[in-house]
Amino acid sequence: MKATGIVRRVDDLGRIVIPKEIRRTLKIREGDPLEIYTEKDGGVIFRKYSPMGDLQDFAAQICESIGANTGHVAAVSDRDCIIALSGAPKRELLDKPNSQALEKLMESRKNYRYTPGGTRLRATEGSDKYHLGVAAPILCQGDLMGCVMLLLGENDPALAEADQRLAQTVAGFLGKQMES
């Protein structure tokens, strides 16, 4: 682990201020949950917590089912990266950071469907091979948790409204699973 050389004091309420540079680098937003671990030698470790991580295996099974039934690449992301994928090589997309366009789309909490001639939104940073066909935000008690996506290749035709409804249904289901 690399030391950053920043020292912070704990205030009367037990709070520690994490510097803006570190929050920006690690993409820690206001209100994001952090896990706190302690080491035997007295060290304290803070790690970003992804509630979607608890559903990673389940999301992978759903992606396999959607991918098999639609013939398209199916993916589920949390707010930071793709956590489940089916229909594409995992090394290309899995655990890759979400693109800024996808983050902006998720923040709007709106469903998305690509239309021919429209702007192609990439799912991940640095990958031009796939773009969003449909996307539906995963909401849990009003909080944004991630996104369900069907991805298209360069020459794939646009997806139908039924595919968009499928993504919406799966996103709603995953949101309900997180509530329980």
Where in this protein do the model-derived segments appear?
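Short loop/turn motifs at secondary-structure junctions and domain boundaries
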Residues: M1, I28, S65-A68, G126-Y130
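Juxtadomain coupling helices with adjacent low-complexity linkers
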Residues: Q56-S65, N98, L102-E103, M149-S180
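Structured interaction and signal-relay segments at domain junctions
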Residues: C63-E125
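Short glycine-/small-residue motifs
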Residues: L85, G146-C147
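A short, aliphatic-rich beta-strand micro-motif
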Residues: L132-L139
